[in-house]
Amino acid sequence: LVGSEMCIRDSLSAIRARHRRGEVPSRPVRFILFADEEGSGDLGSTWMGQNHPEVFDGVTEAISEVGGFSLPTPSGKRAYVVQSAEKGLWWFRMKTTGLAGHGSMHNPNNAVTRLAAAVNRIASHQWPDLRHPVQEEFLARAAELWNLTIDRDNVERSLAPLGPLALMAGSGCTNMVTPTVLDAGYKANVIPSRATAELDARFIPGHEDEMIATIKELAGEGIEFETISTNPSVEAPWRGPAVDAITRALQAEDDGAVVLPFLNPAGTDGKGFGELPNGRHIDCYGCTPLRLPEGFEFLSLFHGVDERVPLDALQFGARVVDRVLGES
């Protein structure tokens, strides 16, 4: 029970509680469920945003998944990270052709070796540090809270006291490309005439074009590109009514809580709100509140075989969401 499922559960619990108490928010609140978030959003939030933007008329802020979970600090207080930016994505396929033949014969026009070399160049490329302002603030606050010195060349190692969040934070400091699917051939002694690879590219807001240009340069000649899916990056200001409401709600339920922003290296339904057809956009924040026991490896359970969170963490989340709705 991680991510969107918890967001739905917290929201429904808070809405039900307010309905039973006869309490109405000071302004309209829309509870919208989308399909396809784990795919690409092309048939979910993105489709709705492009085809039915009227659904979002009057909406200025949105709260979705990824964020709001607690981390212990040396002072004894808990820190809660809230997503206020996320990387964009480009899922793409690389294809190449060559000369088919027998595996026992030298073949200088081997599609598999050409593709493998291209994939290796892209996967091993050292992407430059592109620290987004949101990530800069997160790292500065983290260094203060955990008494750390941040090594810009190895952010993940610097943030080791934060556990699995260190990997997430480090991945949010650069563009990244990860090979995920390889397909070629059908028999060990037959050189195939074609080979394909699928890769997952994630870019820091504002750096999409340079990332794609670098990928194509690294691939070299003889490689054809095909886009599988693309989504924009997302940014929301770390200020305003939504941020204030989230902060006050967390601190009301956890005295002394520290709330800080972070850039999500993955994606959420927030990508569907960034570029609405009428020129509007909706500031989207990731906050599924969870007060977790110290030592609970929450992030390592994402998409695992035993996704779970403590019941009292869910109850805490429902109370926080209820308070946020009360300030709406």
Residue ranges and their predicted role:
Residues 15-40:
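Short helix-loop-beta-strand segments that form the rim/entrance of peptidase-like active sites
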Residues 32-41, 65-70, 100, 291:
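Acidic, glycine-rich active-site loops and adjacent beta-strand->loop/helix elements
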Residues 50-68:
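A glycine-rich helix N-cap at a beta->alpha junction
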Residues 1-8:
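Short, small-residue-biased leader/transition segments that mark boundaries at the very start
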Residues 70-71, 128-189, 193, 205-213, ...:
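An extended, acidic, His-containing surface patch that forms the Zn2+-binding/catalytic region
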Residues 26, 57-58, 77, 85-91, ...:
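Short, solvent-exposed loop/turn segments at the edges of secondary structure
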Residues 46-48, 99, 103-128:
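A short core secondary-structure module
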Residues 66-68, 78-93, 290-303:
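Flexible glycine/proline-rich, aromatic-decorated loop/lid segments
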